[in-house]
Protein backbone atom coordinates (compact mmCIF):
# COMPACT_ATOMS: atom_id res chain seq x y z
CA UNK A 1 0.00 0.00 0.00
CA UNK A 2 1.33 3.45 -0.94
CA UNK A 3 2.43 5.70 1.89
CA UNK A 4 0.02 8.56 2.65
CA UNK A 5 1.54 11.93 3.50
CA UNK A 6 0.04 14.61 5.74
CA UNK A 7 1.01 18.17 6.63
CA UNK A 8 -0.49 18.58 10.08
CA UNK A 9 -0.19 22.38 10.28
CA UNK A 10 -1.02 25.09 7.79
CA UNK A 11 -2.09 28.53 9.00
CA UNK A 12 -4.48 29.00 6.10
CA UNK A 13 -5.64 27.46 2.85
CA UNK A 14 -6.18 28.94 -0.60
CA UNK A 15 -6.03 27.65 -4.17
CA UNK A 16 -2.25 28.02 -4.27
CA UNK A 17 -1.83 25.99 -1.10
CA UNK A 18 -4.15 23.29 -2.40
CA UNK A 19 -2.20 23.07 -5.66
CA UNK A 20 1.11 22.82 -3.79
CA UNK A 21 -0.14 20.14 -1.39
CA UNK A 22 -1.63 18.03 -4.17
CA UNK A 23 1.45 18.53 -6.34
CA UNK A 24 3.74 17.31 -3.56
CA UNK A 25 1.62 14.21 -3.02
CA UNK A 26 -0.10 15.06 0.26
CA UNK A 27 -3.40 13.29 0.93
CA UNK A 28 -4.25 15.02 4.22
CA UNK A 29 -3.73 18.47 5.68
CA UNK A 30 -4.68 20.21 8.89
CA UNK A 31 -5.53 23.90 8.63
CA UNK A 32 -5.96 26.52 11.34
CA UNK A 33 -8.04 29.07 9.44
CA UNK A 34 -10.15 26.93 7.14
CA UNK A 35 -13.10 28.01 5.03
CA UNK A 36 -15.69 25.50 3.87
CA UNK A 37 -15.17 26.70 0.29
CA UNK A 38 -11.51 25.71 0.16
CA UNK A 39 -12.10 22.52 2.15
CA UNK A 40 -14.53 21.43 -0.56
CA UNK A 41 -12.16 22.43 -3.38
CA UNK A 42 -9.43 20.36 -1.73
CA UNK A 43 -11.75 17.37 -1.33
CA UNK A 44 -12.56 17.39 -5.04
CA UNK A 45 -8.83 17.07 -5.77
CA UNK A 46 -8.35 14.13 -3.41
CA UNK A 47 -7.02 16.14 -0.46
CA UNK A 48 -8.76 15.63 2.89
CA UNK A 49 -8.58 18.75 5.06
CA UNK A 50 -9.26 18.87 8.80
CA UNK A 51 -9.68 21.92 11.01
CA UNK A 52 -6.98 22.70 13.55
CA UNK A 53 -7.20 24.67 16.79
CA UNK A 54 -3.99 25.97 18.30
CA UNK A 55 -4.01 27.06 21.94
CA UNK A 56 -1.24 29.14 23.54
CA UNK A 57 -1.87 28.70 27.28
CA UNK A 58 0.23 30.31 29.97
CA UNK A 59 -1.11 28.08 32.74
CA UNK A 60 -2.72 24.73 33.45
CA UNK A 61 -6.10 26.31 34.21
CA UNK A 62 -6.06 28.33 30.98
CA UNK A 63 -5.36 25.18 28.98
CA UNK A 64 -8.11 23.20 30.70
CA UNK A 65 -10.61 25.99 30.00
CA UNK A 66 -9.58 26.03 26.34
CA UNK A 67 -9.98 22.27 25.98
CA UNK A 68 -13.68 22.57 26.85
CA UNK A 69 -14.18 24.46 23.57
CA UNK A 70 -13.01 21.71 21.23
CA UNK A 71 -15.40 20.05 18.82
CA UNK A 72 -14.32 17.69 16.03
CA UNK A 73 -11.02 19.48 15.38
CA UNK A 74 -7.36 18.59 15.69
CA UNK A 75 -6.08 20.21 18.90
CA UNK A 76 -2.52 21.46 19.17
CA UNK A 77 -1.03 23.27 22.14
CA UNK A 78 1.89 25.69 22.13
CA UNK A 79 2.56 25.87 25.88
CA UNK A 80 3.95 29.16 27.17
CA UNK A 81 4.84 27.87 30.64
CA UNK A 82 6.24 24.73 32.21
CA UNK A 83 2.92 24.15 34.00
CA UNK A 84 0.95 24.33 30.75
CA UNK A 85 3.50 22.06 29.07
CA UNK A 86 3.23 19.37 31.76
CA UNK A 87 -0.56 19.37 31.36
CA UNK A 88 -0.50 19.37 27.55
CA UNK A 89 1.89 16.42 27.40
CA UNK A 90 -0.52 14.15 29.28
CA UNK A 91 -4.06 15.40 28.52
CA UNK A 92 -5.59 12.97 26.00
CA UNK A 93 -7.66 15.73 24.37
CA UNK A 94 -4.43 17.22 23.02
CA UNK A 95 -3.36 15.80 19.66
CA UNK A 96 0.06 17.45 19.45
CA UNK A 97 2.28 19.65 21.59
CA UNK A 98 4.01 22.21 19.38
CA UNK A 99 7.72 22.62 20.06
CA UNK A 100 8.98 26.22 20.01
CA UNK A 101 11.94 28.32 21.05
CA UNK A 102 10.43 29.39 24.36
CA UNK A 103 9.38 25.94 25.56
CA UNK A 104 10.55 24.83 29.02
CA UNK A 105 13.74 22.77 29.02
CA UNK A 106 13.21 19.02 28.98
CA UNK A 107 14.01 17.23 32.25
CA UNK A 108 13.12 13.99 34.05
CA UNK A 109 9.83 15.38 35.39
CA UNK A 110 8.68 16.26 31.88
CA UNK A 111 9.79 12.84 30.62
CA UNK A 112 7.70 11.17 33.34
CA UNK A 113 4.43 12.73 32.14
CA UNK A 114 5.19 12.81 28.40
CA UNK A 115 2.46 10.80 26.64
CA UNK A 116 1.26 12.89 23.70
CA UNK A 117 2.83 13.36 20.29
CA UNK A 118 4.96 16.43 19.71
CA UNK A 119 4.92 18.56 16.60
CA UNK A 120 7.98 20.10 15.00
CA UNK A 121 6.88 22.95 12.76
CA UNK A 122 9.37 24.34 10.24
CA UNK A 123 7.95 27.82 10.85
CA UNK A 124 8.79 27.52 14.56
CA UNK A 125 12.25 26.21 13.69
CA UNK A 126 12.87 29.23 11.46
CA UNK A 127 11.85 31.55 14.30
CA UNK A 128 14.57 29.94 16.44
CA UNK A 129 17.29 30.93 13.96
CA UNK A 130 18.64 33.71 16.19
CA UNK A 131 17.83 31.99 19.48
CA UNK A 132 20.64 29.56 20.27
CA UNK A 133 19.21 28.48 23.63
CA UNK A 134 15.75 27.95 22.17
CA UNK A 135 17.12 25.98 19.24
CA UNK A 136 19.13 23.73 21.56
CA UNK A 137 16.05 23.07 23.67
CA UNK A 138 13.97 22.27 20.60
CA UNK A 139 16.64 19.86 19.35
CA UNK A 140 16.80 18.23 22.80
CA UNK A 141 13.05 17.52 22.64
CA UNK A 142 13.37 15.98 19.18
CA UNK A 143 16.20 13.73 20.31
CA UNK A 144 14.41 12.65 23.49
CA UNK A 145 11.28 11.91 21.49
CA UNK A 146 13.17 9.72 19.01
CA UNK A 147 15.14 8.07 21.83
CA UNK A 148 11.97 7.24 23.78
CA UNK A 149 9.91 6.37 20.69
CA UNK A 150 7.45 9.19 21.30
CA UNK A 151 5.53 10.06 18.11
CA UNK A 152 6.80 13.17 16.32
CA UNK A 153 4.90 14.92 13.54
CA UNK A 154 6.79 17.36 11.32
CA UNK A 155 4.71 20.12 9.76
CA UNK A 156 5.38 23.15 7.59
CA UNK A 157 3.43 25.69 9.64
CA UNK A 158 2.97 27.38 6.28
CA UNK A 159 1.06 30.62 5.88
CA UNK A 160 1.30 30.54 2.08
CA UNK A 161 1.93 28.11 -0.77
CA UNK A 162 5.57 29.23 -0.98
CA UNK A 163 6.19 27.93 2.55
CA UNK A 164 4.83 24.42 1.91
CA UNK A 165 7.59 21.82 1.62
CA UNK A 166 7.57 18.35 0.04
CA UNK A 167 7.02 15.58 2.62
CA UNK A 168 10.46 14.06 2.08
CA UNK A 169 12.06 17.43 2.81
CA UNK A 170 10.10 17.75 6.06
CA UNK A 171 11.21 14.23 6.99
CA UNK A 172 14.85 15.21 6.47
CA UNK A 173 14.44 18.16 8.86
CA UNK A 174 13.81 15.79 11.77
CA UNK A 175 16.63 13.51 10.62
CA UNK A 176 19.07 16.43 10.59
CA UNK A 177 18.12 17.50 14.12
CA UNK A 178 18.49 13.98 15.51
CA UNK A 179 21.62 12.90 13.61
CA UNK A 180 19.80 10.24 11.61
CA UNK A 181 20.99 9.48 8.09
CA UNK A 182 17.63 8.60 6.53
CA UNK A 183 14.53 10.81 6.41
CA UNK A 184 12.05 10.08 9.21
CA UNK A 185 9.10 9.37 6.92
CA UNK A 186 6.80 8.29 9.76
CA UNK A 187 6.86 11.91 10.95
CA UNK A 188 5.06 13.02 7.77
CA UNK A 189 2.98 9.90 7.21
CA UNK A 190 2.10 7.33 9.88
CA UNK A 191 2.15 9.69 12.88
CA UNK A 192 0.16 12.65 11.46
CA UNK A 193 -2.16 10.38 9.46
CA UNK A 194 -3.02 8.40 12.61
CA UNK A 195 -3.69 11.63 14.50
CA UNK A 196 -5.88 13.10 11.76
CA UNK A 197 -7.83 9.89 11.14
CA UNK A 198 -8.86 9.37 14.76
CA UNK A 199 -12.53 9.57 15.75
CA UNK A 200 -13.24 13.05 17.16
CA UNK A 201 -16.96 12.70 17.90
Role assignments for model-derived ranges:
Residues 76-79:
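Short beta-strand elements of ligand-binding domains
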Residues 1-31, 36-52, 57-65, 70, ...:
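Charged catalytic cores and adjacent phosphate/nucleic-acid-binding surfaces used
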